[in-house]
A protein has these predicted regions:
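Intrinsically disordered, low-complexity regulatory regions enriched in serine/threonine/proline
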Residues: 1-17, 26-127
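Extended, Lys/Arg-enriched charged tracts that mediate electrostatic binding to polyanionic substrates
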Residues: 21
Length: 127
């Protein structure tokens, strides 16, 4: 669980506004035992759930309703990046595979995109 503890600290720093301004709490943690370095975190507030995960090459964020189950399958969750592109009315860009970015940089890029648009994204899940 050491790897997940380190990842959790990074997520709490990179996405601090989710915890401090939008009342998200960490409610789920899973470290993949068969694949080194894989970690999945589940966040929740009164409106929705967010999964932030890392694999050996990817850091990503998915968002879903309160009834979506925290699991690697991500059933019931939607790509946070794709939803943000929809909100911003921009074409969804696939990552440039010529450049390798650390999971931390990938998550920081997502956070930079999410922060000014988080209210609109959360509105999609309000009843």
């Amino acid at each position: 669980m050491k790897k997940c503890a380190e990842f959790t600290e990074k997520v709490e720093t990179i996405f601090d506004y989710l915890f401090n301004e939008h009342d998200f709490v960490l409610v789920f943690t899973r470290e993949e035992t068969k694949r080194s370095g894989y970690c999945l975190l589940g966040l929740q507030n009164a409106v929705c759930r967010i999964v932030i995960y890392k694999t050996w090459s990817e850091g990503n964020l998915w968002i879903g309703p309160l009834n979506a189950a925290f699991d690697w399958a991500l059933e019931g969750f939607y790509s946070g990046g794709a939803l943000l592109m929809f909100i911003l009315k921009q074409d969804f860009q696939l990552p440039d595979f010529k450049e390798f970015h650390s999971t931390e940089i990938q998550l920081q890029n997502l956070s930079d995109l999410l922060k000014p648009n988080v209210e609109e994204l959360l509105d999609l899940f309000k009843e």
